[in-house]
Curated annotation (Swiss-Prot):
GO terms for cellular component: extracellular region. This is Dermonecrotic toxin LapSicTox-alphaIB2. Disulfide bonds join C45-C51, C47-C190. It comes from Loxosceles apachea (Apache recluse spider). It catalyses: an N-(acyl)-sphingosylphosphocholine = an N-(acyl)-sphingosyl-1,3-cyclic phosphate + choline; an N-(acyl)-sphingosylphosphoethanolamine = an N-(acyl)-sphingosyl-1,3-cyclic phosphate + ethanolamine; a 1-acyl-sn-glycero-3-phosphocholine = a 1-acyl-sn-glycero-2,3-cyclic phosphate + choline; a 1-acyl-sn-glycero-3-phosphoethanolamine = a 1-acyl-sn-glycero-2,3-cyclic phosphate + ethanolamine.
């Protein structure tokens, strides 16, 4: 999965997919009542990026729905996964459940079209704080209450705080999550970060009793760091330059081993060689 980083304005969906991304990451900011309000990152953000592009969350969802609904004039067949980077740092811990509930209602109405031929992409809810695990509970219970528990088949999870892998496993236990787990590791492109924790996550993914299904690394903009991440065995790379990742995947060393994921590749299944 080539994951376009910080796609927060509607027009950037086309821009990143046209550069080679089959997945995008979008920042979601919340108001003081835990309503998802804007797709917005803000300052500081990655080097060589403009941090202030934004859209109202529901308007972004509508554009995303069009981009992932077969038959729509804006449809992109290869856009198959969306990571919502949930900026819950502005919320109190006790608002996490409400944030999940409100997020689910927004997605149900504006992305899934109330279960009636909505967008088809798989969705990852990426949460920066382990203490906010109840966001998952709120999301799940709301879809059930609203009569669409089947949509949870399209939803996965990520805790993005680079926490100890054992602590992450524990948070999932509390949230009642037993699958659909993506594990992120990384740092802004302005700084360097080694691959030690990525290797631990990959080892967990590949062990018989691990909780992780997929591992992705962020934010990778250079050819050499792309090669290093692929060599470490990641499933996804988040980038500001999808074309760079696509180029490396075309190199002879990687062409035979990796391919770009399509809609038929289940993002919740651990890949077995």
């Amino acid at each position: 999965w080539i994951m376009g980083h910080m796609v927060n304005a509607n027009y950037q969906i086309d821009e990143f997919v046209n550069l080679g991304a089959n997945s995008i990451e979008t920042d979601v900011s919340f108001d003081s009542s835990a309503n998802p309000e804007y797709t917005y990152h803000g300052v500081p953000c990655d080097c060589r990026r403009w941090c202030k592009k934004w859209e109202y969350f529901n308007n972004f969802l509508k554009a995303l729905r069009k981009a992932t609904t077969p038959g729509d004039s804006k449809y992109h067949e290869k856009l198959v996964l969306v990571v919502f980077d949930l900026k819950t740092g502005s919320l109190y811990d006790n608002q996490a459940y409400d944030a999940g509930k409100k997020l689910a209602k927004n997605l149900l109405q504006h992305y899934w079209n109330n279960g009636n031929n909505g967008g088809r992409a798989y969705i990852v809810l990426s949460i920066p704080n382990l203490a906010h695990y109840k966001l998952i509970t709120g999301f799940k219970e709301t879809l059930k209450t609203e009569g669409h528990p089947e949509l949870m088949e399209k939803v996965g999870y990520d805790f993005s705080g680079n926490d100890d892998i054992g602590d992450v496993a524990n948070a999932y236990k509390k949230a009642g999550v037993t699958g659909h787990v993506w594990q992120s590791d990384g740092i802004t492109n302005c700084l360097l970060r080694g691959l030690d924790r990525v290797r631990k996550a990959v080892a967990n993914r590949d062990s018989s009793n691990g909780y992780i299904n997929k591992v992705y690394y962020w934010t990778v903009d250079k050819r050499q760091s792309t090669r290093d991440a692929l060599d470490a065995g990641v499933d996804g790379i988040m980038t500001n330059y999808p074309d760079v990742i696509a180029d490396v995947l075309n190199e002879s060393a990687y062409k035979a081993k990796f391919r770009i994921a399509s809609y038929d590749d289940n993002p919740w299944e651990t890949f077995k060689n």
